[in-house]
């Protein structure tokens, strides 16, 4: 079945096919259609929708539902995402699967409702307290708003971790055709750890507190070991990169601009290609290094350089110090979007 829907609506459809039981949320532009869609479709399919009194309540309601073994989700935008950071840390600390969708808008402060990718650091590195991070995916189309929401639930369940679907206001509002899955994901069995009120789960304990420092350190190391194993699930894609002299690195909506930029440059005789991380955490370092080795690298992003810094860091960690040092950034902020003309002009300066 194919539907012509907004990216935000595609998120709700993906959540339903992933088997999401409960949606807790508070509407905020430009993510409000996710709450609207959940309010409409969840009850129709026997699922639960709760409009919370605020974003802080939403994420803590998710903690309770996840602790009871229910698949749950919330969605928000910049200011609301900030309010959820403590709760996401608690989810990570208790190793609870849950999905948070952030439709990034311009900031800081109230900002405006136009697109940015400026929430990169809290979405990817963990914006709350402690040594944690989420499994973070970055869709680039309405189709992927559905598909990667499903993946986020699968990875949250697999790794017992909060997962973030990181998109922006442009992706949330644009409309495209979305092919829906043929069937719903099977319900996972959480009885080995969840507190479900049954005899077999009565001794399960969900917590994130370790009063003994040695035990707290041991648990922290357990999390870091888990995050290292998560790297096996890193995803990326390349486009026209095999013979490229310049590699354009971008994710989300910026990756679509990057593809058109590469095509435009090639039409003018400049061999350009693209690398797109699909997961931002874990970051596909090895794949990036393979694509970037010996090439000029340019980043397109809607931020002040947070993503470009991560590209440099991952290239340097992969032993490509020269490529890392040469990374150039073309960006816009405040709700402005990089144009293909901007990117083509910047690329010509790099080569």
Regions found by a protein language model. Give the residues of each.
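Conformationally flexible catalytic loops at phosphate/diphosphate-handling active centers
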Residues: 160-238
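Peripheral docking tails and interdomain loops at the edges
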Residues: 302-351
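Thiamine diphosphate
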Residues: 1-126, 133, 141, 339-348
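Glycine-/acidic-rich phosphate or pyrophosphate-binding loops and their flanking alpha/beta elements
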Residues: 4-10, 223-246, 259
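Conserved thiamine diphosphate
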Residues: 115-168
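Redox- and metal-dependent alpha/beta enzyme cores, enriched for Fe-S-associated oxidoreductases
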Residues: 235-271, 275, 281-288
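Short helix-loop-beta junction
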Residues: 39-44, 222, 260-274, 317-318
């Amino acid at each position: 079945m194919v539907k012509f829907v907004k990216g935000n609506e595609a998120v709700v459809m993906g959540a339903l096919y992933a088997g999401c039981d409960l949606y807790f949320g508070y509407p905020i532009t430009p993510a409000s259609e996710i709450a609207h869609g959940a309010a409409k479709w969840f009850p129709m399919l026997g699922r639960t929708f709760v409009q919370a009194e605020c974003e802080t309540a939403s994420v803590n309601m998710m903690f309770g539902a996840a602790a009871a073994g229910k698949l749950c989700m919330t969605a928000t935008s910049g200011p609301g995402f900030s309010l959820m950071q403590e709760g996401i840390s608690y989810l990570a600390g208790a190793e609870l699967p849950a999905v948070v969708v952030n439709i990034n808008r311009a900031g800081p402060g109230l900002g405006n409702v136009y697109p940015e990718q400026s929430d990169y650091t809290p979405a990817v590195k963990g914006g709350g307290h402690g040594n944690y991070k989420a499994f973070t995916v970055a869709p680039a189309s309405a189709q992927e708003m559905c598909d990667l929401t499903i993946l986020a639930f699968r990875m949250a369940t697999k790794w017992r971790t909060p997962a973030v679907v990181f998109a922006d206001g442009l992706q949330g509002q644009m409309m495209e055709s979305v092919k829906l899955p043929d069937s719903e994901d099977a319900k996972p069995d959480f009885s080995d750890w969840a507190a479900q009120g049954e005899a077999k789960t009565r001794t399960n304990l969900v917590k994130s507190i370790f009063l003994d420092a040695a035990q707290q350190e041991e648990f922290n190391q357990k999390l870091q070991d888990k995050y290292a194993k998560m790297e096996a699930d890193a995803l990326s894609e390349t486009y026209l990169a095999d013979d490229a002299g310049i590699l354009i690195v971008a994710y989300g909506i910026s990756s679509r601009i990057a593809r058109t930029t590469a095509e435009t440059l090639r039409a003018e005789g400049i061999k350009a290609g693209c690398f797109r991380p699909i997961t931002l955490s874990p970051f596909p370092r090895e794949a990036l290094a393979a694509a970037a080795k010996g090439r000029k690298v340019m980043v397109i992003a809607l931020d002040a350089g947070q993503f470009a810094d991560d590209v440099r860091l991952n290239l340097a960690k992969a032993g490509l110090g020269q490529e890392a040092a040469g990374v150039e950034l073309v960006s816009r902020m405040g709700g402005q979007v990089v144009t293909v003309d901007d990117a083509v002009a910047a690329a010509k300066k790099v080569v």
